[in-house]
């Protein structure tokens, strides 16, 4: 089922357009509030399912916050993973190569692998595994060396459809600032 590509990309592009037309930070906050209210609840409940489910009981089961909202977030993470320039090139390549065609997530990601030179096969696990990972961050400041060490630990919940969740790649952007 490739609905997650069509709808995830549509939601992502709508969010980006809205951010360009308004205040980008305010729009992002609104998008995240909606994601946390709708999709996180779905991912943490009995109806948790992958963004690209292998099967479904009813066609209505496909039109969910996971397919739309989480699908958009996966594209946003892809942009972070490959960088803005490679993302733009990958998107241009995707439209040039596949406009008007029925395509798969694999076709979509192949364009970004080609544009960025990165292997994104591990990243595709996001489409097959339900649940919302939790990141726990701890930091340690070494006064003597002036070094900040940030340690991130990911935990993935079991869901009704996945009793053995695996770690998922998560692109992270971080910055540190001095007091002055």
Where are these regions (language model features)?
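Hydrophobic alpha-helical and helix-loop surface patches within well-folded domains
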Residues: 1-141, 150
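Beta-strand-rich binding/interaction modules
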Residues: 119-121, 130-180
């Amino acid at each position: 089922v490739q609905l997650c590509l069509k709808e995830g990309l549509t939601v992502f592009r709508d969010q980006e357009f809205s951010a360009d037309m308004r205040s980008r930070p305010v729009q992002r906050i609104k998008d995240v509030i909606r994601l946390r209210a709708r999709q996180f609840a779905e991912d943490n409940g009995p109806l948790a399912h992958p963004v690209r489910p292998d099967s479904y009981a009813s066609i209505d089961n496909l039109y969910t916050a996971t397919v739309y909202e989480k699908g958009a977030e996966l594209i946003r993470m892809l942009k972070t993973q490959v960088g803005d320039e490679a993302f733009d090139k990958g998107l241009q390549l995707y439209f040039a190569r596949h406009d008007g065609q029925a395509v798969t997530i694999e076709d979509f990601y192949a364009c970004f692998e080609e544009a960025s030179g990165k292997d994104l096969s591990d990243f595709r696990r996001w489409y097959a595994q339900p649940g919302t990972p939790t990141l726990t961050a701890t930091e340690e400041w070494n006064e003597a060396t002036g070094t900040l060490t940030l340690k991130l630990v990911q935990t993935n919940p079991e869901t009704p459809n996945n009793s053995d969740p695996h770690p998922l790649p998560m692109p992270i952007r971080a910055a540190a600032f001095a007091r002055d």
